[in-house]
């Protein structure tokens, strides 16, 4: 790591969290690592009570002060049930919410904030706070470089594709942007060039792409060698651009418990399976396919005879075919939670079946495991396209939805056929590059030192 200068005694960093989906956990991981490296700096971590309670444990560094903030939902207001409604209410209220809480935290700690570290989605709150406090703004983008490119060049994409003509051009590639030659229009996130471009969320992400070049630094959970074209471009677009991942590999041994939480015995089960034979299926709690597709997954697994571990919420298990669990008891296991990183890194793991969220993709890359992707929303489609067409380490499920036959064919292709073997080779090459990036003198290791300087010593 590039050795940072000695932190000043009055360093105080505000960490503003976007408390939805999987955004909060990586930013907490970065904050913990920064706090460990700079013990004299106070990090005030702002998120909603619900987000904080689901993430935080007693073993976070003592120089992290946790603050619960309002969720932006007016008192007595009844949400529609659409998750995006809660997101939009929070985004609209965020600047005032964080302004109020930041002032209170400064009084409590007795130190002025010198740096505002935020999720990039909170660009407006960040710029507002940074300007008022004359503090630096360091932004964390929670996706990959390809999806960030779509946001950074939204205006160029709209101009070249045409918002009104987009329906006829969905299959065309975005070759007019360097590095996007294999990305199709339909792979971009909703709100870039199709969908409701006037929604609060779409406007927020559009403006985020315009605001990020004004940040003191932008960092992502990735590594330079995965997307070298984008890395070079971002270095000219941003004041400072830092890849500091994969975060799962960057954790030091002292931060990682030797005791793995595995309440359902997944690791003992996988020990008995042959090399590269197991399918791991997991979609998390935010984006699970509909019941009819859960049935198709179950049918495909049972018919294929592929050994499997399926992490599925208990409430979703009621949708599985009658008798499925009994009939496949020797073939696999369905559990409400599984130690994902440890499973992916086991030599018996053959394929990761996921929605293609960035954290899942990077964990699969870090473990050298091919993927079967079923995009659901957000950046899933653009990540899945990168998996299939750019890095060639997996496939996207045919027709975009799970069917019994389609899933069985995908399993066979990845686990048995020759092109699946090539995917495995490509995935292992990326795993090696990821390991090199986080090693001493590796690009991500050095970049974390740069991030530490930006956050603690303000560049």
Swiss-Prot record:
The protein's enzyme class: transferase
Enzyme Commission number(s) of this protein: 2.4.1.-
The UniProt record lists the keyword Glycosyltransferase: yes
Binding residues annotated for UDP-alpha-D-glucose, in chain numbering: 338-340, 355-363, 377-380
Gene3D superfamilies membership: Glycogen Phosphorylase B
Family of the protein in this entry: Belongs to the UDP-glycosyltransferase family.
Name under which the protein is recorded: UDP-glycosyltransferase 78D3
Native source species: Arabidopsis thaliana (Mouse-ear cress)
